[in-house]
């Protein structure tokens, strides 16, 4: 597919075909599955989404971050086609395969740090975090999880507890998972004037030591840059101080 890389509106929004599809959707799709935009996508190329009415939109979300190299990127299309022709799917925990091992090798070889590295792959970020917490609790024998103000981690029961905002994802869904504590995040625009990243990290560490106790902490989960929380970039030195 080769779409002109610009916004083009051919009908009102939503167009008649999208409205028809939306009526069909309301009859069969759970109301719990929301949609931000009232348009139904028919195709995509590069940074452009095309709906069923022929309107073209610039995808500023990059498919929610997972297609930063563009829609229908030819290298990706070729790789998917090659793999689908080779075999479609088998469960790695039943009958493993080489591409999984190769992907783990690629990931771990590019990770920083002088320590043994291993990887596991999951479908979503929330699923990955559920497993992170399970692994950390098993490995440490501890149960407490530390997260940070303004964080967003997912929509499972555990990750909704790890989110900073209760609304909209956690509204009316209690009780959520326990043993999760939110610590103050470095937020240069809101922190006291002149607070450094190191000072913000020590603030969080001191809070967790008092609130949780280092001997109870299984893991600390943090977004290096917070997206849904407000595009918050911590002050320089915050992450490295936490890491130490």
Feature map (PLM): residue ranges:
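Catalytic PLP-binding core of fold-type I/II PLP enzymes
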Residues: 214, 232-244
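Active-site and channel-lining beta-strand-loop segments
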Residues: 38-60
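Active-site-adjacent loop/helix segments that line or gate small-molecule/cofactor pockets in enzymes
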Residues: 2-45, 95, 100, 200
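Short acidic, glycine-rich surface-loop motifs adjacent to enzyme active sites
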Residues: 214-231
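PLP-dependent aspartate aminotransferase-fold enzymes
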Residues: 105-219, 237
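Short, small-residue-enriched loops and turns at beta-alpha junctions
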Residues: 66-68, 96, 189-190, 227-229
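Glycine-rich loop-to-alpha-helix module at the N-terminal edge of alpha/beta enzyme cores
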Residues: 2, 6-10, 56-142
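Gly-rich Lys/Arg/Thr-decorated short loops/hinges at beta-loop-alpha junctions or inter-strand turns
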Residues: 30, 84-88, 179-193, 224-226
């Amino acid at each position: 597919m080769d779409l002109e890389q610009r916004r083009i509106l051919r009908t009102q929004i939503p167009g008649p075909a999208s409205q028809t599809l939306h009526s069909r959707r309301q009859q069969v799709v759970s109301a719990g599955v929301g949609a931000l935009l009232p348009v139904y996508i028919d195709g995509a190329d590069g940074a452009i989404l095309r709906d069923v009415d022929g309107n073209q939109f610039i995808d500023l979300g990059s498919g929610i971050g997972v297609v930063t190299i563009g829609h229908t990127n030819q290298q990706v299309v070729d790789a998917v086609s090659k793999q689908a022709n080779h075999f479609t799917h088998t469960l790695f925990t039943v009958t493993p395969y080489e591409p999984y091992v190769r992907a783990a090798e690629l990931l771990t070889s590019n990770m920083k740090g002088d320590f043994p590295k291993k990887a596991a792959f999951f479908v979503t970020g929330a699923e990955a975090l559920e497993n992170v917490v399970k692994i950390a609790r098993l490995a440490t024998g501890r149960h407490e999880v530390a997260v940070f103000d303004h964080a967003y981690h997912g929509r499972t029961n555990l990750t909704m507890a790890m989110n900073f905002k209760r609304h909209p994802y956690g509204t009316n869904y209690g009780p959520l998972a326990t043993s999760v504590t939110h610590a103050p995040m470095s937020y240069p625009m809101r922190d006291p004037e002149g607070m450094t990243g190191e000072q913000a990290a020590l603030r969080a560490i001191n809070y967790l030591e008092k609130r949780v106790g280092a001997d109870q902490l299984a893991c600390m989960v943090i977004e290096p840059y917070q997206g849904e929380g407000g595009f918050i970039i911590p002050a320089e030195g915050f992450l490295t101080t936490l890491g130490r």
